[in-house]
């Protein structure tokens, strides 16, 4: 973990797809933002760092294993975390779940006192772990994650149920068992029951609030 004297504090939230990571991250961001203001806290999703695949056909894009660490541009994410800690702004990539690739536009992110980083594969990369001041693993049963993923991907990402189930069986579950679950050992805090664990959220809020003092 990094020294807490750095200008920008990085908090990592990892766990299975649809485990409740984004809900915890958004809840912490919303409630802490009310206390300290937009200028002091931000959220960066690991999904923004899926590699640019604009050169591939849609058939090839659909076949990509998006749950393998090689699908992520962790080198760029690592560079961006270092830049934020130096006090420099970054250009955050924009990823389209419909087009299955990175968009041309970017979003400028200014340095903040606290950056909440959330994604499935964050703890699999030693470089990213070293940049985090502390890390969280959201530990939710896989059957619950699957039900949430079906609902999310069909309703929000334009997927069919058959395609969601096929992807889950072919890559999502195997990659969770191979990469994501073993990375739980690197987490400082393990949160059971997903994003609606109010007690865990309050404990995390208290911990993060220390960085604003």
Swiss-Prot record:
Pathway, per record: Pyrimidine metabolism; CTP biosynthesis via salvage pathway; CTP from cytidine: step 1/3; Pyrimidine metabolism; UMP biosynthesis via salvage pathway; UMP from uridine: step 1/1
Keyword set, alphabetical order: ATP-binding, Cytoplasm, Kinase, Nucleotide-binding, Transferase
Main location: cytoplasm
Single GO cellular component term: cytoplasm
Enzyme class: transferase
Residue positions binding ATP: 15-22
Catalysed reactions listed for this entry: uridine + ATP = UMP + ADP + H(+); cytidine + ATP = CMP + ADP + H(+)
Biological-process GO terms, alphabetical: CTP salvage; UMP salvage
SUPFAM superfamilies given in the database record: P-loop containing nucleoside triphosphate hydrolases
Subcellular location: Cytoplasm
EC number of the protein: 2.7.1.48
One MF annotation (Gene Ontology) recorded for this entry: cytidine kinase activity
UniProt cross-references to InterPro entries, sorted A to Z: P-loop_NTPase (IPR027417), PRK/URK (IPR006083), Uridine_kinase (IPR026008), Uridine_kinase-like (IPR000764)
Family, as annotated: Belongs to the uridine kinase family.
The name this protein goes by in its record: Uridine kinase
Native species: Salmonella gallinarum (strain 287/91 / NCTC 13346)
């Amino acid at each position: 973990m990094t020294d807490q004297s750095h200008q920008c504090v990085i908090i990592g939230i990892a766990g299975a797809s649809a485990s409740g990571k984004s809900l915890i991250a958004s809840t912490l961001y919303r409630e802490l933002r009310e206390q300290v203001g937009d200028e002091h806290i931000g959220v960066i999703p690991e999904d923004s760092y899926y590699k640019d695949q604009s050169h591939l056909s849609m058939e090839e894009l659909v076949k990509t294993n998006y749950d393998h660490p090689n699908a992520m541009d962790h080198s760029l994410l690592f560079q961006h975390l270092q830049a934020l800690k130096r006090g420099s702004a970054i250009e955050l990539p924009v990823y389209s779940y419909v087009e299955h690739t990175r968009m041309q536009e970017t979003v400028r992110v200014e340095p903040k006192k606290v950056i909440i980083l959330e994604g499935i594969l964050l703890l699999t990369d030693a470089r990213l772990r070293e940049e985090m001041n502390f890390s969280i693993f959201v530990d939710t049963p896989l059957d619950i994650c699957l039900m949430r993923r079906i609902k999310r991907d069909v309703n929000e990402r334009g997927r069919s149920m058959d395609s969601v189930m096929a992807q889950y069986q072919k890559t999502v579950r195997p990659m969770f068992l191979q990469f994501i679950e073993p990375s739980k050992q690197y987490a400082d805090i393990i949160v059971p029951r997903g994003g609606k664990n109010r007690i865990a959220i309050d404990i995390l809020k208290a911990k993060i609030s220390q960085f604003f003092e």
